[in-house]
Swiss-Prot record:
One of its GO terms (biological process) is nucleotide metabolic process. Belongs to the Maf family. YhdE subfamily. It comes from the Bacteria. It catalyses: dTTP + H2O = dTMP + diphosphate + H(+); UTP + H2O = UMP + diphosphate + H(+). The record marks 11, 71, 155 as: Important for substrate specificity. Nucleoside triphosphate pyrophosphatase that hydrolyzes dTTP and UTP. May have a dual role in cell division arrest and in preventing the incorporation of modified nucleotides into cellular nucleic acids. One of its GO terms (molecular function) is UTP diphosphatase activity. This is dTTP/UTP pyrophosphatase. Its EC number is 3.6.1.9. It is an enzyme of class 3 (hydrolase). Keywords: Cytoplasm, Hydrolase, Nucleotide metabolism. One of its GO terms (cellular component) is cytoplasm.
């Protein structure tokens, strides 16, 4: 059966290729602003991932396995999205430096042939070291933080700020592979 990744993220595409050799990418145009955060970050990321997957399911005219995910960075139970601009990136990174924060991913797998849907979420604790303002500004100049939740990419230059990680590394990148592997086995 065809496998579809409902994501434009090159990071998710690269990660999924470690589990599945052949899959299609169909970018979901689900409006994430329709999902209202009501206090549970687990529920929030699962609801967005479900919205993305259902958006693709409703367009298909053949059976498929659909995979979608959403990842957010949180500190003090506040969601840190992608920065609006360089100043916002600076403020986000500054708020993370020297502190622990949590990265949550919601993952949804749909088997349209069986009309089955599995939703899971995972959190990973990340601790940043102390970072000088100059280091933050140099990092922002690379452009890397501008399209990432929490304004950093652990798999890129932003990884140098990480002092400690507790949990799934791939969750922080955007697709928790171990969790997804078991979800795919369960839904077959």
């Amino acid at each position: 059966m065809k496998v579809i990744l409902a994501s434009a993220s090159e990071r998710r595409q690269e990660l999924l290729s470690r589990l599945i050799k052949t899959f299609d990418v169909i970018v979901s145009n689900f409006d994430e602003s329709k999902v209202i955060f009501e206090g549970s970050i687990d529920r929030y990321v699962k609801d967005i991932a479900l919205g993305k997957a259902m958006n693709i399911k409703n367009k298909l005219d053949e059976d498929a396995i659909i995979i979608s995910a959403d990842t957010v960075v949180t500190i003090d139970n506040m969601i840190l999205g992608k920065p609006r601009d360089e100043e916002d990136a600076f403020n986000i990174i500054k708020s993370l430096q020297g502190r622990k924060h949590l990265v949550y991913s919601g993952v949804v797998v749909i088997n349209t042939a069986k009309n089955l849907t599995i939703q899971e979420s995972l959190s990973t604790e990340v601790t940043f070291s102390e970072i000088s303002d100059d280091e933050i500004l140099e990092y922002i100049k690379t452009g890397e933080p501008l399209d990432k939740a929490g304004a950093y990419g652990i798999q890129g230059i932003g990884g140098i700020f990480v002092e400690e990680i507790r949990g799934c590394y791939y969750n922080v990148v955007g697709l928790p592979l171990n969790k997804l592997k078991f979800m795919l086995k369960e839904i077959q």
